[in-house]
From Swiss-Prot:
InterPro entries: Ankyrin_rpt (IPR002110), Ankyrin_rpt-contain_sf (IPR036770). It comes from the Bacteria. Pfam families: Ank_2 (PF12796). ANK repeats lie at residues 24-53, 54-83. Keywords: ANK repeat, Repeat. SMART domains: ANK. Gene3D superfamilies: Ankyrin repeat-containing domain. This is Putative ankyrin repeat protein RF_0782.
Length: 181
């Protein structure tokens, strides 16, 4: 991501606690993620926002508020998913919980995937998709949208490079549940 227009994203600590721990304002990116504003998240990322900045990073706030598209985008772009919350909750466990709760939202993307991803990635509409498959296609769409937002050129090489996500994406979700017949 390239920082543009001298916009300051990584803010300084407001003060420090009695034990010397820096106290920050909320990260703008995390705040946008918490309220589900995909457009603002994309804008901040295009300006060079730090995905993992702040005591409660954007990926966690997106998970806790159930904003799946933002979760996919941040995770695909390298957000830290291994941070445990102060109350002991594990982000990836929360993520899986939300994933299973959001079947309806995932279903809605079947037609989008057929209409848009198929043209670019050879999606076979006759092949049932399981959760893993749907995540891969959904993430490709999110990345495609983000690249378009950032006005980056789309080339076949760029598209082919996305295949590495297929190999490494969401390995912690092992269930293969056929949710689309």
């Amino acid at each position: 991501m390239l920082a543009q227009d001298n916009i300051q994203i990584n803010i300084e600590p407001v003060t420090t606690s009695s034990s010397g721990i820096p106290i920050y304002h909320y990260s703008p990116l995390a705040t946008a993620a918490s309220v589900g504003s995909v457009e603002i998240v994309e804008a901040l990322l295009s300006k060079g926002a730090d995905i993992n900045f702040g005591s409660t990073p954007s990926f966690i706030t997106a998970i806790k508020n159930g904003h799946l598209k933002i979760c996919y985008l941040l995770k695909a772009l390298g957000a830290n998913t291994q941070i445990n919350l102060p109350n002991g909750e594990k982000p990836l466990e929360l993520y899986k919980d939300y994933l299973y709760k959001f079947y309806d939202e995932l279903y809605e993307f079947k037609q989008t995937i057929q209409d848009r991803a198929g043209a670019y990635y050879g999606y076979d509409k006759n092949k049932p998709l399981n959760i893993k498959d749907l995540e891969i296609w959904y993430t490709k769409l999110v990345i495609w949208d983000f690249k378009a937002f950032s006005r980056k050129a789309h080339t076949m090489k760029e598209i082919e490079e996305l295949s590495e996500y297929e190999q490494n994406l969401f390995p912690e979700i092992t269930d293969s549940v056929n949710i689309i017949g």
